[in-house]
């Protein structure tokens, strides 16, 4: 495998303002460097100090790290704690009346929930689960809308030592069945339906369909939240949320867990092949989530924080359910979508709730640019202090719009690189210390030993692309793949790298300043005439064109070049057809050739009103690869937000 070439040239840099730097918890590069040096000098001591500072222990640990069974690492293994206790109980003495959650429904109703109220709801539901026979080590599948009860269910599982597996509410019955079967779950928690963008989406009916398939015999009970007035089928196996919690005590003694006991399994999305059950620990995971929340967002106790993710994904686990609550934060939880009832919804909510820290996905940013690039200017967004992005690399042009239009040039952009498997942010600017660059996730957080290597495991020189690895195990790292340790080793600690480094599966390069630039997944790397090009860079070039709102690039086999470049493009205006489409396609091909070079010029350009995305906003690139190759689509498309656009994307301009 030859070295991946980096062709994206981005030179803009934005240091923290003096005003921001002065109020920041980690202020200035010297403070950042001091933390990094502390981690380098005494790696175990660095993490042990953080674990003692940020977590409350029932039984303090004496052993920090155990690598004797590498790559099955252990952290704080002889310590005991409870994750729910760390997120709720410990705040009650001084902050019982502090708002934990500001919940806004799809139709705009707002309900504040205090830490005391959240604690009582979690205890009641935990007692309800215990009454169903759920206990330590049992698996519970949660298939819920984005409502506070989803967080209650997760925290209740953590409280009694049950292992939760949240399945995103957009997954099909087949995908749900696969996860129930792999986890051998005992209980499913769901709702009659969810409400998204004014539309009702049945959930209980999907659960019933999944449980009617082979392989779900482990399920004993289904708990159903009545989210709307729509009735749903209720059999002998089913019980309503209200019936389960009625009369349950408002206190529930936490189950004290070993630091290494599993907290949850989260299956990586079905759009990336056979689901892998990513298993996270209790203490190490919580430490990563809480500390990175504090550092990456410069969190202050009076902040109003809003992450727009769904709890069905790792971002919703780490930066809604666990990290913010462990730190005692107040956060907005939103049931709806950014474009309902109109494209001003996010900005209106930021104004109304006086949000200080806003964390969303580049996909949402790009779609909001398309729907109204000037809309944010109609709202008072002066409360914002930090803007974050997550889920995929952000194109420099989208970054600049986010920075200038949403943040008014005041707010650092915290572009966070991390994964389901890492549990918490790995590479991200500490906003009071690190200058940001559009499109770069900047520098590793202190204690994260990230590097870029070639296929032999040797470090590559600046400006050359390679494989992103993390050279030392860290507390929030995935512990194994549920029931598949061999796959865990082969996937993340492959023999080619002597089994030593965590292989992220992303290609990246590092510039002369040490900044990391994610170029895309290793399988999103194109080999065009012997040149390895990251799809991210071609997409960035396309999006830099004033006509283009969004672009996704994939490869398809080519007799001469090895791979041809196929671009799927959404324009800011209406979708072109016929001669107009040919004209715009020719213009965009010339544009890319000018921006990057002829080598990266797309062979085919196809226009759609949108790109095929899962309901969490991820572009389904495997689907695009099938379309590009002219293959029949065999992938599960049940998580697609917009299946009707597939026909448009078959047409070559």
UniProtKB/Swiss-Prot annotation:
Record's function text? Catalyzes the conversion of acetate into acetyl-CoA (AcCoA), an essential intermediate at the junction of anabolic and catabolic pathways. AcsA undergoes a two-step reaction. In the first half reaction, AcsA combines acetate with ATP to form acetyl-adenylate (AcAMP) intermediate. In the second half reaction, it can then transfer the acetyl group from AcAMP to the sulfhydryl group of CoA, forming the product AcCoA.
Question: Which residues are recorded as binding ATP?
Answer: 391-393, 415-420, 506, 521, 532
Provide the family line: Belongs to the ATP-dependent AMP-binding enzyme family.
Is Lyase found in the keyword set?
A: no
> A single GO molecular function, which one?
ATP binding
Does the keyword field hold Transport?
no
Record keywords: Acetylation, ATP-binding, Ligase, Magnesium, Metal-binding, Nucleotide-binding
Q: Which residues carry this modification: N6-acetyllysine?
A: 618
> Which species is listed as the source?
Laribacter hongkongensis (strain HLHK9)
PANTHER family cross-referenced by the UniProt entry: ACETYL-COENZYME A SYNTHETASE (PTHR24095), ACETYL-COENZYME A SYNTHETASE 1 (PTHR24095:SF14)
Any idea which positions bind Mg(2+)?
A: 543, 548
Q: Which reaction does it catalyse?
A: acetate + ATP + CoA = acetyl-CoA + AMP + diphosphate
Q: May I have one GO cellular component term?
A: cytosol
Q: Which InterPro entries match?
A: Ac_CoA_lig, ACAS_N, AMP-bd_C, AMP-bd_C_sf, AMP-binding_CS, AMP-dep_synth/lig_dom, ANL_N_sf
Q: What is this protein called?
A: Acetyl-coenzyme A synthetase
Q: Which cofactor does it need?
A: Mg(2+)
Domain of life where this protein originates: Bacteria
Give the record's PTM text: Acetylated. Deacetylation by the SIR2-homolog deacetylase activates the enzyme.
Query: Which EC class, in a word?
Result: ligase
Which residues are involved in binding CoA? Answer: 196-199, 315, 529
HAMAP family the UniProt entry points to = Ac_CoA_synth
User: Biological process GO annotation list?
Assistant: acetyl-CoA biosynthetic process from acetate
**What are the EC numbers?**
6.2.1.1
């Amino acid at each position: 495998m030859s070295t991946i070439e980096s062709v994206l040239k981005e030179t803009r840099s934005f240091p923290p303002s003096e005003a921001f730097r002065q109020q920041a918890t980690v202020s200035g590069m010297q403070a950042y460097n001091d933390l990094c040096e502390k981690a380098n000098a005494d790696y175990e001591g660095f993490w042990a100090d953080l674990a003692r500072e940020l977590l409350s222990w029932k039984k303090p640990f004496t052993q920090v790290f155990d690598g004797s069974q590498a790559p099955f690492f252990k952290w704080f293994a002889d310590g005991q704690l409870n994750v729910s206790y760390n997120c709720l109980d410990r705040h009650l003495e001084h902050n019982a009346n502090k708002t934990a959650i500001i919940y806004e429904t799809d139709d705009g109703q707002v309900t504040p929930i205090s830490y005391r109220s959240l604690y009582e709801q979690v205890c009641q539901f935990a007692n309800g689960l215990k009454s169903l026979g759920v206990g330590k080590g049992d698996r519970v599948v949660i298939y819920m809308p984005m409502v506070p009860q989803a967080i209650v269910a997760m925290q209740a599982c953590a409280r009694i030592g049950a292992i939760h597996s949240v399945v995103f509410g957009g997954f099909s019955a087949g995908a749900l069945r696969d996860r129930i079967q792999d986890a051998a779950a005992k209980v499913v928690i769901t709702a009659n339906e969810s409400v998204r963008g004014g539309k009702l989406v049945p959930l209980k009916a999907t659960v019933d369909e999944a449980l009617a398939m082979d392989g779900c015999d482990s399920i004993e009970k289904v708990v159903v939240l009545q989210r709307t007035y729509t009735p749903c089928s209720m059999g002998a196996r089913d019980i309503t949320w209200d019936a389960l919690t009625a009369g349950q005590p408002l206190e529930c003694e936490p189950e004290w867990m070993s630091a290494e006991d599993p907290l949850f399994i989260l299956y990586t999305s079905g759009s990336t092949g056979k689901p892998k059950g990513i298993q996270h620990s209790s203490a190490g995971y919580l430490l990563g989530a809480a500390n990175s929340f504090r550092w990456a967002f410069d969190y202050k106790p009076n902040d109003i924080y809003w992450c727009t993710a769904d709890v069905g994904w790792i971002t919703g686990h780490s930066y809604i359910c666990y990290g913010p609550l462990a730190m005692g934060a107040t956060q907005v939880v939103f049931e709806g979508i950014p474009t309902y009832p109109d494209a001003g919804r996010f900005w209106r909510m930021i104004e109304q709730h006086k949000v200080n820290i806003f964390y969303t996905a580049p996909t949402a940013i790009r779609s909001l640019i398309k729907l109204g690039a000037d809309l944010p200017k109609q709202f008072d967004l002066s409360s914002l202090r930090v803007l974050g992005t997550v889920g995929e690399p952000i194109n420099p042009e989208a970054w600049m719009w986010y920075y200038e239009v949403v943040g008014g040039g005041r707010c650092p952009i915290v572009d966070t690189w991390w994964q389901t498997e890492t549990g918490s942010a790995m590479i991200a600017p500490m906003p009071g210390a690190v200058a940001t660059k559009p499109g770069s996730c900047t520098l590793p957080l202190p204690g994260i030993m990230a590097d870029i290597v070639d296929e032999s495991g040797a470090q590559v020189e600046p400006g050359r692309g390679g494989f992103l690895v993390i050279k030392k195990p860290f507390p929030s790292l995935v512990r194994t793949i549920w029931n598949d340790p061999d796959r865990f080793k082969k996937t993340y600690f492959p023999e080619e790298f002597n089994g030593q480094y965590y292989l992220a599966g992303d290609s990246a390069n590092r510039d002369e300043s040490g900044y990391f630039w994610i170029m895309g997944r290793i399988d999103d790397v194109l080999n065009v005439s012997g040149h390895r090009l990251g799809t991210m860079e071609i997409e960035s070039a396309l999006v830099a064109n004033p006509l283009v709102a969004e672009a996704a690039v994939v490869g398809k086999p080519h007799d001469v070049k090895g791979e041809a470049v196929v671009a799927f493009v959404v324009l800011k205006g209406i979708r072109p057809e016929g001669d107009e489409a040919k004209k715009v396609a020719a213009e965009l091909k010339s544009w890319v050739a000018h921006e990057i070079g002829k080598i990266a010029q797309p062979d085919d350009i196809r226009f759609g009103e949108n790109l095929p995305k899962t309901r969490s906003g991820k572009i389904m690139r495997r689907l695009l690869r099938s379309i590009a190759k002219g293959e029949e689509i065999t992938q599960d498309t049940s998580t697609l937000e917009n299946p009707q656009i597939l026909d448009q994307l078959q047409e070559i301009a």
